[in-house]
Amino acid sequence: MRLRGIDVAAYDPSPNASAVLDDVMADAVSAWDALGLSTDHVGSLTLYASIEEAVADAGLIQESVPERLDTKHSTLAAIDAVAPADAIIASSTSGYKPTDLATSMSRPDRLVVAHPFNPVYLLPLVEIVGGQQTSLGTIDRAMDTYRALGMHPLHVRKEIDAFIADRLLEAVWREALWLVNDGIATTEEIDDAIRYGFGLRWAQMGTFETYRIAGGEGGMRHFMEQFGPALKWPWTKLMDTPELTEELIDTIAEQSDEQAAGRSIRDLAQERDRNLVAILRALESVDAGAGKTITNLRALQA
C-alpha cells in the first residue's frame, strides 16, 4: 500500500516491529526501483499502541496475526468493534474459511479473506474469499481495492480450506516430504527439479495451458485421454504425509542449512527478490502472466 502512496496505520505488539517493517520497506523500494516503477511518493507508516487507534480512520483493514483460530477471533472482534462502518475487514489467513473467522464479529458482512503471497510487493496474486454472510458489495469493493493497488485479485467463489494456491502447494509439499523421507532426493535436488524444470513453465503459463501444449494439435482433450489413466498409477502419496519425526526434521534442516551455504535469511530474501524482478521484467516484455500486472502498475502511476 505504501508503495502506492497510501498512508498506513499499523498495530504490532512485537518490540522489534518497527525495525522489521523498515527492513521490509527497504527491500520493497529496492525491488520497485529495479523494476523501474516510481517510488517517489511512498505513503507514511504510523505504528500505534492499540488496535483501536490503528483502525480508527481505515478504509481497508488487513489482519495478519498468526494462524491460530482463537487469536484471529479475538483480533477480528476487536477490529469489528471499532472500525469505521464502511471499512473492509480482510484476513490474510492462508487456510481458514471466512465463515469460520467471522463468528466473533457483529458485522460479518464486511469480512473477506484476502490471502496474499510473499513477498507481497512483488507477487501480485491475492485470493479474495467471501463467507456465508459476506455481502456481494464487500467482495466487489475488495476486488476493486486490491486491483487499484496493482495486485491481481482472484475471486474464490466457493469457500474451501486453504483456497486455491495453497492447496496446490500443499500437494507438492507433501510429495517433497516423502521424497526426502524415503531417501530418494535431497532438499536441493527437489528444488533443482522445480527451478530448472516445471517451475519455469508455471511462471508464465501455469498447469493447464502447459498440458494443452503437451496434447499437441488435439489439445487438452487429447492430453487427458492419453495421460489421464496415469492418475490411477501408484506414483504419488498425495493423500498421506510422512510422520514428522525428529529424524526427518533433522534431515531436512541439515540439508537446508547445507543448501543455504552460509547465506543469511536476509541474503536469500534479497536474492529471491532480484530473481523475481528479472522474471517479472521478462514476462512484462512479452505481456504474459504476472508481467501484465507490472504494465498495469505503470499505467496507474502515469
Regions found by a protein language model. Give the residues of each.
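Rossmann-fold NAD(P) dinucleotide-binding segment
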Residues: I51-L111
